[in-house]
């Protein structure tokens, strides 16, 4: 019982302590919120409103001031009283140990303080800006009016440099003067915000006018002096070159100068209307056009030098190529008596001959135009270059064709010599096979041998035709070469098989008396070897039989054969 009482007392003390701690914590937060409220109340909103109210306000400024005052009245008459009530509610909840309710209320108080602070910031910021604006307007107004007076003086002293743009500039200045008068009126009426907008507009416009006054004299100098002088110099240079014999009608300079004068008039109107960017762009484009005309004249002078330097050499080159072409025609006539010349090959010559005639005709026309002065030197230069390129191409094609004609005789002699060589090669191959003392020759080889002879006969017969068709000769020649190579390969293979069969049977004889199956298969191999001369088949049968008795024996025999070691020495 005693211990229960002690435990109860401890629990009560713990509850009271916890309540005290929580209560103290909530009062601490409430006090902090109260301090924030006091700081907000101490902000000088009323003082700032009083300062601004002393100013003479109208228009936008007055409307803004009224909105700020209305916002402050709301804070003073509604938001602060509401805040007091909620603070009292938080204290009551804390006293009654309604800590959860107290927490909710404290959070609401924080939000209310944020709203009040935000509204007060807006009011004070606007009032401050208005006071500064009034002071700044006065300062900037003085500076703006001084700058405007300077512009007026500059127009009076340097107006002659503005030419026909002077009335337009003066009109702009008159508009600015009206805006400055309006600024004074708005300031007197107390509409300081709208007055500030006017000051900013005037400052911006003055910068534009100042920049325009800097650019106008140079642009007028371009349209009134520089460009006309440039065109006069261009015309003088053009006329001098015409007197020297240049054909320049393609430039249509009179028409172009008339057009450029119209462009200058348009650019001058742009300057007068203060469309300076468009005028500047047009002036730059016109300078570029004049430069292009000068480039054309310079190109004509360079082209004249080129024509004078290259006309005679091109004429000589044309004559030389005509001589080559005539010689080639004679060569074709001679060759056709002995050799057949394909129509395709003749077409190549005829095509180059036609190109040569065209080049000659173009050169003659060009020479006549140069003599009469009816062609621009640039066009004459282009034509000369085209003729020269054509002559280079024609020369290469005709040289190639001439070489092909010369090679016909060379190819004929080589084909005749090779036919003799192939006959000698067959005789040599026959003798080599005789020395091998073969039991006989298989039908397949005899057929190849006969076909080889026919191929050489066909080649020799083709070489006796008149006129000689070298394309057909070349085809028969290639066939004969292929047949000889094939025959030689078969002969070498056959002799190789014969030697290997002899070595394999000789090695297998050591097992012959002891192995009847081997003996029978060796007899079969020997029948193919001696009777029908199927040496490859005989080798296959003998090798298969030997491998049954001794695996790997053929490799030993083959190695001994390659090393020229006697079969009897193989272990």
Curated annotation (Swiss-Prot):
Role played: Negative regulator of FtsZ ring formation; modulates the frequency and position of FtsZ ring formation. Inhibits FtsZ ring formation at polar sites. Interacts either with FtsZ or with one of its binding partners to promote depolymerization.
TM region positions: 4-22
Claim: DNA-binding is one of the keywords in the record: no
GO CC, any one term: plasma membrane
Membrane side Extracellular: residue ranges: 1-3
NCBIfam families: PRK04778.1-2
Gene Ontology biological-process annotations: division septum assembly; septin ring assembly
Membrane topology: Single-pass membrane protein
UniProtKB keywords: Cell cycle, Cell division, Cell membrane, Coiled coil, Membrane, Septation, Transmembrane, Transmembrane helix
Cellular localization per UniProt: Cell membrane
Similarity annotation: Belongs to the EzrA family.
Coiled-coil region: 169-214, 249-298, 326-374, 400-438, 474-529
Topological region Cytoplasmic: 23-571
Organism of derivation: Listeria welshimeri serovar 6b (strain ATCC 35897 / DSM 20650 / CCUG 15529 / CIP 8149 / NCTC 11857 / SLCC 5334 / V8)
Protein name, entry field: Septation ring formation regulator EzrA
């Amino acid at each position: 019982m005693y211990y229960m009482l002690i435990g109860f007392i401890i629990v009560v003390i713990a509850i009271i302590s916890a309540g005290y701690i929580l209560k103290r914590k909530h009062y601490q937060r409430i006090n902090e919120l109260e301090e924030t409220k006091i700081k907000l109340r101490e902000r000088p909103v009323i003082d700032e409103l009083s300062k601004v109210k002393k100013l003479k306000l109208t228009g936008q400024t007055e409307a803004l001031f009224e909105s700020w005052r209305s916002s402050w009245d709301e804070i003073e008459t509604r938001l602060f009283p509401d805040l007091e009530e909620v603070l009292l509610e938080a204290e009551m909840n804390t006293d009654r140990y309604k800590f959860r309710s107290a927490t909710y209320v404290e959070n609401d108080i924080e939000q209310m303080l944020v709203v009040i602070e935000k509204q007060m910031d807006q009011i004070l910021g606007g009032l401050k800006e208005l006071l500064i604006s009034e002071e700044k307007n006065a300062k900037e107004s003085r500076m703006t009016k001084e700058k405007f007076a300077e512009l007026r003086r500059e127009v009076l002293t340097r107006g002659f440099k503005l030419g026909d743009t002077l009335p337009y500039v003066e009109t702009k200045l008159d508009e600015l003067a009206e805006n400055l008068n309006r600024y004074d009126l708005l300031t007197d009426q107390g509409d300081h915000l709208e007055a500030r907008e006017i000051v900013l507009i005037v400052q911006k416009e003055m910068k534009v006018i100042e920049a325009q006054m800097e650019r106008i004299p140079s642009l007028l100098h371009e349209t009134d002096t520089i460009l006309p002088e440039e065109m006069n110099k261009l015309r003088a240079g053009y006329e001098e070159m015409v007197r020297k014999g240049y054909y320049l009608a393609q430039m249509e300079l009179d028409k172009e100068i008339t057009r450029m004068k119209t462009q200058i008039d348009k650019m001058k109107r742009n300057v007068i209307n203060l469309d300076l960017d468009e005028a500047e762009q047009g002036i730059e484009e016109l300078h570029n056009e004049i430069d292009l005309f000068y480039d054309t004249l310079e190109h004509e002078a360079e082209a004249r030098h080129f024509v004078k330097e290259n006309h005679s050499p091109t004429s000589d080159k044309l004559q030389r190529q005509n001589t080559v072409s005539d010689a080639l025609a004679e060569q074709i006539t001679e060759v056709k008596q002995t050799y057949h010349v394909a129509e395709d090959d003749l077409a190549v010559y005829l095509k180059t001959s036609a190109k040569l005639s065209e080049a000659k005709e173009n050169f003659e026309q060009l020479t006549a135009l140069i003599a009469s002065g009816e062609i621009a030197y640039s066009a004459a230069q282009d034509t000369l270059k085209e003729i020269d390129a054509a002559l280079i191409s024609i020369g290469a094609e005709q040289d190639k064709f001439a070489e092909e004609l010369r090679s016909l005789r060379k190819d004929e002699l080589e084909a005749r010599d090779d036919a003799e060589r192939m006959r000698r090669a067959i005789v040599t191959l026959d003798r080599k096979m005789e020395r091998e003392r073969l039991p006989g020759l298989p039908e397949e080889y005899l057929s190849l041998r006969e076909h080889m002879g026919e191929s050489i006969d066909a080649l020799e017969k083709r070489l006796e035709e008149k006129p000689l068709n070298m394309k057909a000769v070349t085809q028969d020649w290639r066939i004969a070469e292929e047949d000889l190579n094939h025959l030689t390969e078969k002969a070498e293979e056959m002799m190789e098989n014969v030697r290997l069969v002899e070595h394999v049977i000789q090695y297998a004889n050591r097992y012959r008396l002891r192995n009847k199956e081997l003996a029978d298969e060796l007899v079969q191999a020997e029948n193919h070897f001696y009777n029908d001369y199927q040496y490859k088949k005989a080798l296959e049968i003998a090798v298969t039989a030997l491998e049954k008795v001794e695996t790997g024996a053929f490799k030993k025999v083959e190695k001994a054969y390659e090393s020229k070691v006697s079969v009897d020495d193989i272990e």
